[in-house]
Amino acid sequence: MKNSADITVLGAGSYGTALAISLASNGHKTLLWGHDPVHMQTLAQDKCNQAFLPGIAFPDCLQIEADLAKALAASNNVLVVVPSHVFGTVLEQAKPLLRSDARIVWATKGLEPETGRLLQDVARDVLGEQYPLAVLSGPTFAKELAMGLPTAISVAGTCPTFTNYLVELLHSPKRLRVYANDDFTGLQLGGAVKNVIAIGAGMSDGIGFGANARTALITRGLVELTRLGEALGANAATFMGMAGLGDLVLTCTDNQSRNRRFGLALGKGCDVMTAQAEIGQVVEGYRNTKEVFTLAKRLGVEMPITEQIYQVLYQGKSPVDAAKELLSREKKSETPAQ
C-alpha cells in the first residue's frame, strides 16, 4: 500500500507536536493525530498548538487528522508520543487499524505502570512479533525542538533497516542530529530514570542545597541508571550518550523540565498534590518513580536516590529527611571492586 504521508504521529501534546513540526520542517509530509476531537479541530483551525506551543506555526507539510483510522492508513511509519501510562491503551486502539507493513517507533519516556516493564514488552504483548519496533530518546525540550533550536537524539530498534530509515527521516543539518544505537533496552530506560532523578535535583534546589549538591545527585543518579541498565542487559556506554547523560543533565538543570519544577515545589514545602497542580501538565516522573522503584526491587538493584524520592512521593517523607538519610548512608568506595 502506498503512503500518502511519510509518517503519522500519535499524540498531540507538546512533545508529539514538536516532533511533528520538526519532521514537517524537514519537508516530510506528517500527519498529527490526538485523542481529543475538539483539540484537533482547534489545531487545524489555528495551524498552531496554542495550548502547548503558543506562537509556533505549523509547517505546510504538517496536517491534522482527527480520525485514527485515516491517520494510520496514511503511512506505515507510526510515531507514538503519549504519556507512558496510556501507551498500552493507545496501541490497543491502534492495533486493528494498523497496516500490515506498519513500523512502530515511540518517543514516550517511562515504564509500564504498576509492573515497571519496558515499553518494548508492552508493545510486544499488544502487537505481537509482526511489526518492527524502535525508540527515540535524548535531550529534547519540546519548545526548543519546535522552534528549530539544535539538539541531538539517539534511535534504536529491532530492525536496522527501520532504525536507519528513522535516522534519515529525523536528521536535519540545521536543527537535529540523529545517532543510531543498537541498545534498544538502554535507550528506553534512560528516558524513564532521568525523570526520577530530575525530581530529586529539583527537591535539592528547592531545599536550597546549591549547585554542588545538584551535581553530586546527578552524578550518583547516573550511577543508579547504569546499575539498573546493566541488570537488564543494557550497554553501560549507552548511558554516557544522548539518552543517558544528555537527557539527565538537561532535565535536572533547566526549569523547562516539569519533573524538575515538580521537585522544586516539593523542596520548598508543597505537598505532592499541590506541586502537581502547580505544573498543570503531566509530570511523568511521578509515575516513573514508582515504576523504576518497583523494577529495581524486583531485580535487587540498589538505587538509594530513587528509593528516597519514592518515599517522599508515596510514603509522605519530607525532602529534608530524605536528604539526611542519603547523606548519612554507610561510607563506601566510589568505584567498588568488580
Swiss-Prot record:
Q: Where in the cell is it found?
A: Cytoplasm
Record's keyword annotation contains Lipid metabolism: yes
The enzyme's E.C. designation: 1.1.1.94
Q: Which PROSITE patterns match?
A: NAD_G3PDH
What does the entry give for GO biological process? carbohydrate metabolic process; glycerol-3-phosphate biosynthetic process; glycerol-3-phosphate catabolic process; glycerophospholipid biosynthetic process
Q: Which reaction does it catalyse?
A: sn-glycerol 3-phosphate + NAD(+) = dihydroxyacetone phosphate + NADH + H(+); sn-glycerol 3-phosphate + NADP(+) = dihydroxyacetone phosphate + NADPH + H(+)
- What's the domain of life for this entry? Bacteria
* Keywords assigned: Cytoplasm, Lipid biosynthesis, Lipid metabolism, NAD, NADP, Nucleotide-binding, Oxidoreductase, Phospholipid biosynthesis, Phospholipid metabolism
Which Gene Ontology cellular component terms are annotated? cytosol
Question: Sorted alphabetically, which Gene3D superfamilies does this protein's record hold?
Answer: N-(1-d-carboxylethyl)-l-norvaline Dehydrogenase, domain 2 (1.10.1040.10), NAD(P)-binding Rossmann-like Domain (3.40.50.720)
GO MF annotation, one: glycerol-3-phosphate dehydrogenase [NAD(P)+] activity
- NADP as a keyword of this entry, yes or no, is yes
Per the record, the pathway is: Membrane lipid metabolism; glycerophospholipid metabolism
Which residues does the record give as sn-glycerol 3-phosphate binding sites? 109, 138, 140, 194, 247, 257-259
Q: What does this protein do?
A: Catalyzes the reduction of the glycolytic intermediate dihydroxyacetone phosphate (DHAP) to sn-glycerol 3-phosphate (G3P), the key precursor for phospholipid synthesis.
Q: Which family does it belong to?
A: Belongs to the NAD-dependent glycerol-3-phosphate dehydrogenase family.
Q: Which NCBIfam families match?
A: PRK00094.1-1 (NF000939), PRK00094.1-2 (NF000940), PRK00094.1-4 (NF000942)
Q: What is this protein called?
A: Glycerol-3-phosphate dehydrogenase [NAD(P)+]
- Gene from which this protein is expressed: gpsA
